[in-house]
Amino acid sequence: MDISKKEKLKLLLEQIRMPDNEIEAHFSNSYLDKVEVHKADKKWHFYINIDHVLPFQTYQLFHHSLKESFASIAEVSLTLSAENRHCPEGDIQIYWKHFIAQTSLSPAYRDLVLDQAPEVSNNKIMLTARNEAEASALKKRLEAKFHDFCLSIGSLPYTLEVEVKTNTEAMQEFRDKKALEDQQLVMKTVQEKEKRDKDKSVPDQQPLAIGYKIQDEPITMDQIIDEERRITVQGYVFDAEVRELRSGRSLLIIKATDYTDSIQIKMFSKGDEDAAKFASVKKGMWVKARGSIQTDMYTNELAMMAKDIHEIHVSQRMDDASEDKKRVELHTHTTMSQMDAVVSPEALVEQAAKWGHKAIAITDHAGVQGFPDAHNAGKKHGVKVLYGVEANLVDDGVPIAYNEADRNLYEDTFVVFDVETTGLSAVYDTIIELAAVKIKGGEIVDRFESFANPHHALSQTTIDLTGITDDMVNDAPEVADVLKDFHTWMGNDILVAHNASFDMGFLNQGFQRIDYEKASNPVVDTLELARFLLPELRNHRLNTLCKHLDIELTQHHRAIYDAEATGYLLWKLVQRLVEKEISNHLELNNHMGENNAYQRSRPYHCTLIAQTEEGLKNLYKLVSRAHIDFFYRVPRLPRSVLQKHREGILVGTACDKGEVFETMMQKSEEEAEQVADFYDYIEVQPPENYTHLIEKDLVQNESQILDILRKLVNLGDKMKKTVVATGNVHYLHEHDKQYRQILIGSQAGNPLSRHKLPDTPFRTTTEMINCFHFLGEKKANEIVVDNTQKLTDSIEEISPVKDGLFTPNIEGAEQEMRDLCYNKAKEVYGEPVPQIVVDRLEKELESIIGNGFAVIYLISQKLVKKSLDDGYLVGSRGSVGSSFVATMTEITEVNPLVPHYVCKHCHHHEFFTDGSVASGFDLPDKDCPGCGKGLTKDGQDIPFETFLGFKGDKVPDIDLNFSGDYQPRAHNYTKELFGIDNVYRAGTIGTVAEKTAYGYVKGYASDNQFVYKNAEVDRLVQGCTGVKRTTGQHPGGIIVVPSDKEIYDFTPIQFPADDRNSEWRTTHFDFHSIHDNLLKLDILGHDDPTVIRMLQDLSGMDPKNIPTDDEEVMKIFSGTESLGVTPEQINCKTGTLGVPEFGTKFVRQMLEDTKPKTFAELLIISGLSHGTDVWLGNAQELINDGICQLPDVIGCRDDIMVYLMHKGLDPSMAFTIMEFVRKGKGLKDEWIDEMKKHAVPDWYIESCKKIKYMFPKAHAAAYVLMAVRIAYFKVHHPILFYAAYFTVRADDFELDTMIKGSDAIRKRIEEITVKGNDASPKEKNLLTVLEISLEMCERGFSFKKVDLYQSSATDFIVEGDSLLPPFNAVDGLGTNAALNIVKAREEGEFLSKEDLRERSKISKTVLEYLDNHGCLEGMEDKNQLSLF
C-alpha cells in the first residue's frame, strides 16, 4: 500500500474540513488513488479507494465539502471504490432517492418512480411498471445511469430490473402504505413536539445541528451589504417560524441578530429529519448559519439562504465575585417606568438570580406597577425583592424671602443684581459679569457694573447665551476685586434677584473664596414673588414677566439689562403687595406654599424603599397622594407629605437629578450637607452615568464628576450616612440601550432626547467596582458590596400583594341569600319545594356560603335588582348562569336545571333528567294537568361545577351586561352601597403595542438617517414593545375594598391616564395583579339591554313575556321566509342580519350549513362560533361528512360534562375531561380508555382532541335568549326593530344613499364589495348598515330626510312605515352638535342659516349638507334687519 496516497487523502480531508469523527469511522484505511485534471474544462475528477461503502449522510457531507472547497478552482466529480461493497438496504434506499433527484426525468416518470420504494434483493433494484412500454422506457432511461452511479459511490454490484405489474390494486396498496408511513411520521413528529412542549424542563441532550459542521469564522451582520455566495454568521434567534409548504417540504424562517445588525435566515427541509429539527429552533437560542446571501423575492432585501445551521453556546456576562461578595442593585427602572426603561421586572430579577445576587430593588419613576411581577419573579428565582420608587420630591413652597428681617418694603432701598457666569455651578464655574441697580421708591438711584476675568476661554454656549466674548473679559478685573467692590457698594440693603438661589449661590461662594462671610442681607426672590402674585401665567421667566407688565428688557442675559428690568419688575410687584396687605420683609414667607405652590417647585428625584410592611403601606399612600393630590405634569411628592408618612421607609438621594448631587455640583459642600440631612443614605453612581452633564455644560469634564463623587462619599462618612453605589439601571445589557434611545427619541418634549443618553446597564459586581477604582479598592468594595448588602439586610421580607381574598362584609348576607333563594323557589315551584330544586340549591349554597362567597352573590343581586327596578334588563356573561342560586336571586335569567315544565299557577312540575331534551325552551307546548293553564318551559341542563369548580371553591367571577345607557348609574350605585372610599375602578396599564413601536423605530431611523433591514426593524420593535405608555380603566370593573381595610393595604390609587377631571379613581396596580385579593364587580355596558329597553318603550311589551320558541322567529335562522322576502332580494340566505350573535358573515354561513330549528341548536351554534377549533376542521367536517348531526356535536364546554355523565362516567372524571378539553389540553390515554368503555364514539373523542377553547353554555344561553327576543321584534314588529338597531348599534350612515331606497343601496353595496380589502374601514363598517337598510327597504319600509324641527338628536323615530333619521346620523355631525341643534330649536324658531349655525355651533360643512338635502328649505342665509 502506497503510504503517500494515504497521506494525500489525509491532507485532502483536512483541507475540506471533514470532521474528525467521520474520518476515524470511515476513512482510516482509505487512500487517494488519483486525480484527473482537465485544465481546459476546469474539471477535476477524484478517484478514492475506501474500506466500505459510506453511509449516505457521510457520502453527502464528503461530496459537498469537496465541491465547495474547490468551487473557485474547478468543477469537481468523484468516484469511490469500496473494498467491502455491501450496502445496507436502508442506505441503498436513500442512495436511490438521491440518484433519482439528480437524474433528469419527465414529471410523469419521476412521479411513477417516486411513488414506489424499490425492492432490494440479490443485488437487484426492482421497480414496478404498469405495462411493457413503461417498463422499457424506464429501463432505457435509468439502467445505464444507475450502473454508473453505483460505480461512483463504491463500485456497488447493483443492477436495475423493471417488473410489469398490471394489478392496479397492488400499486394503490403501495401508495396507501406509503401515505400511512408518511402520516405516521408526521404524527410521530407532532407527538415528539408536544412531548417537548410539555416537558420543557428536560432539554434536548444534543445541540441542534442541521447540515454539515460549520468551522468557518463568522462575519458580523453589519458587513452584509451585497449578495454573497457563501458566508457564515452567528446570532441570537429572536424569532423563528416553520411553514409547511404545499410541496410537503418545510421552510424554516429565522430572524437572528448579533447586535450589529439582524438578518432573516431561511432553510428548506431536505427530508423528514430536517423537518423535525426545524421544530426545535426556538427564540432565545444562539445559532451559527452558513449559506448564500441573496435578495429575497418576497421582502426584496438581502437574506441568507442557509445550507447549514448549528446551535452554539455563547458565553454571557457573569458575576464572578464570590458568593458573599456580590453587590445588590438598589436603583432600577423597568418597563413600568413610563416610556423610559426597557427591561421587564421579571427579566431584572431573573438576571439577578443568574448572577447569584441575593436581592434587587425595583425603583420605577413615580409608580410601583412593577411590584407584582417582580414579586412573582422573586418567588420563582429565590431572590429577595426590595420595593421602592423614584419619587419626584418638591418643596411645599419655595421661600420668597431669605435672611428674613424687619424691613419696610415701601421705604427701604433694594440692590437688584444679576450675575452672568461661565456655567451653572458655583463650585466649578465663575462670575464673568456682575451688575446691579439700587432702587428706592421705584426709582434707580445708583448702578454697579463690571466684567470679571475668568482666565480661560469662554465656551460657545456661554457666548451664545450672554453675548459676552473673550475680548470683553480678557482685560477685566479679577473676580475677587469685583466682589470686594460690590460688597462695599451693596452695604446692608435688601438684595433682590430673579431666581435668587442661583445668583446668591455664586455671590456667597465668591465671598467665601475671598474669606468674606456670606451675605447676611435680607433677600427677595422676584421669581417666587411673581409666582405668588401672578399664578395665572404659564411661566415666570424674566422676559415673560417684562412683556406681561410692559417693562422694557433690552438685551436678555446681559447682567446690567437684566438687573434694571428686574428692578422695575420688583417695584411693580411690591405695589401689588398692597392688595395683599403685605408691607414687611418678614411677611413675605407667610404665604409660601399658597396657590398650588407644589406646581411651581422644581421636582428632585429621590429614592424611597419600603423597609417594613408599614413602610410598604406608607409607600402606597405616598404614591397615591402624588398621583391624586399633587399631579402636575408628573406625580409630585411634597416634602411635608413624605415626612408625614416616612415611617418604615428608607429615603435615598437618587441620581444626578437628586438635590444632594445637584447641590454638591452647583453650590457648596456646606449646603450639600444641610440638604443631605433629610436623607437616610447617599447614592453614587458610575461616572458614566453623569457624562451627559458635560454635554449639557453643567460640568466641564470628567475630573469634575469624579471630584463630586469623592465629595459625596466623604460627606457620607462625615455625616455617618451609608453610601451605596447604584446603577440607575434602565436596561439589562449595553446592546439594549438602542431600545431606550428609540423610546426617548419618540418623545419630542422629553428633555432626555436633546442629549446623548448615559450608559445605564445592569452591571456585575466587578464591573461596578471597576467604575469606582478612583476611590481606591477598599472604598470601592465598601460602597459597591458591603454597604449595599448592609442596607439590604436592614429591610424586611415584604410582599407587595396580599394572600387570600378580602371580600366586603354585609351583615347577615348568608341568611339573606338563603331566604332569597327559597322564597323565589317557592314562588316559582311551590311548596314543598321539589327535591331536585332543594338538592341543587343546597349543593350550591353549601359551597357559596362555606367558602365566603355569599356576599359576592348578594352584591350582584342588589345591582341587578336596582337595574330591574329602574326598568332595564340585565344580561349575564360567562358561567354565572351555571348557578341556580344566581337564577333564584335573579342575577341571571338562565336556569341551569334540567329541562322542565312548571305551572305558574298551581306549581305542577315535570323534570326531564335522562338527557332526552337539551333545552327546556324546546319542549312542546303543554297545558297543566292540574289547572289546565299553559305550562312554563325552562331549564338548560348546565352543571354548577362549570362556575365554581368541582369543589365549589373557585372565586366567583360574576360578569353582568347592563344597558350602556344605565351602566354609569350602576357604577355610581356601588358608591351608595359601600362608600366612596371603598370602591374604585379597576386600573389598566397601556403599554407600547407592536404597531406603535414600529412607528417609533421607523421615525428614529428617519430622524437619524439609518437604513434598517426588516429583520432589524422587527428586533427593535420587539425591544420597544411592552413599555408602559399610559394608564386607563377597565370598562366595567369595580374594585370593592372591605370596610375594615384601606385601599392602601392592597394598592396605591390614581386617576385613569392621570386625568384629574375623571369621576373615578382607579387602582394603581393593573387589576389582574390584585384579582385574587379584592372583589371585582364586572358591571359592563352592552347594546342588547339598551335595544331591548328601546323596543319595550316603543312597543309597550314586556320582553320577559316574549316566547322563546316562536315558530316564525325560528325560521329566520335557516331562511328568509318569515321576513316576507327572498334571499335574492336581500343578498342573504338567512334572516339574521342585525340579530346579535347571528348577524356576522361567519355565523350566517354556519346557519346555512346547519339550518338550526331549536333553541338548543342555537346554543350549539353560539358555542361553535365563539370556540377555537370547535367548528372549522372539526364539527363542520363531522356534519358535512354525515358522521353526526348538529344536535350531536360538541358546542359548549358544559355539553362535555353532561354528555359524559349521561354516558355513565364518574362526574369527577367528566368534569376533569371537560376542563382539559376546553383549555386545549386534549385527552389522556386513561380517559380515552374510560370513554370507550362507556361507548363514547371515536368521532367524539377525536373532536375533543382538536379543541383549543370552548364557550360556556351559560354565556351562550344568555346571549341567545337576548337574540331571540330581539329577533321576535324583527319578525313581528319590523319597523321597531330597525329603529332600535339603527339607533343603538349603527355608527356609520350614508343617508343620501339610504333615503333613495333599494336600488341605490344595492348599487353602493356592490361598489364597496368590489373594492375588497381596498375598501376603507369606514366603508367596511358602512357595509353592514347598508345590508340591513336594503333588507328594511325590501320589506316595504323607507327612510325620510332629516327634519330640522322633527328629527331627534340621536334616535331614529318611527313615522308609519318610515324612519326619520336623527341629526347625529348626518355625516360629520357628532352627538354634541346634534344635542345643540335640539336645544337651540327649543329656544325658538331659527331666523336664518346664519342663526342656526351660530346658535347650534354646527360646522359650515354640516350646514351645507342640511341645505343641500332640503332640510333648510325657505330659510334665509342671513338674519334680516326689521325696521319699525
Curated annotation (Swiss-Prot):
GO biological process: DNA-templated DNA replication
Catalytic activity annotation: DNA(n) + a 2'-deoxyribonucleoside 5'-triphosphate = DNA(n+1) + diphosphate
EC supergroup of this enzyme: transferase
Any Pfam family matching the protein: HHH_6
Exonuclease domain ranges (all copies): 414-570
Gene3D superfamilies named in the record: 1.10.150.870, 3.30.1900.20, 6.10.140.1510, Metal-dependent hydrolases (3.20.20.140), Nucleic acid-binding proteins (2.40.50.140), PolC, middle finger domain (1.10.150.700), Ribonuclease H-like superfamily/Ribonuclease H (3.30.420.10)
GO molecular function, a single term: DNA binding
Broad class of the protein's primary localization: cytoplasm
Enzyme Commission number(s) from the entry: 2.7.7.7
Recorded coiled-coil stretches: none
GO-annotated cellular components: cytoplasm
Subcellular location: Cytoplasm
InterPro entries assigned to the protein according to its UniProt record, in alphabetical order: DNA_pol3_alpha_NTPase_dom (IPR011708), DNA_pol3_finger (IPR040982), DNA_PolC-like_N_II (IPR024754), DNA_PolC-type_N_I (IPR028112), DnaE2/DnaE/PolC (IPR004805), DNAPol_HHH (IPR029460), DnaQ (IPR006054), Exonuclease_RNaseT/DNA_pol3 (IPR013520)
Alphabetic keyword roster: Cytoplasm, DNA replication, DNA-directed DNA polymerase, Exonuclease, Hydrolase, Nuclease, Nucleotidyltransferase, Transferase
Family: Belongs to the DNA polymerase type-C family. PolC subfamily.
Name by which UniProt lists this protein: DNA polymerase III PolC-type
Organism: Oceanobacillus iheyensis (strain DSM 14371 / CIP 107618 / JCM 11309 / KCTC 3954 / HTE831)
Gene: polC
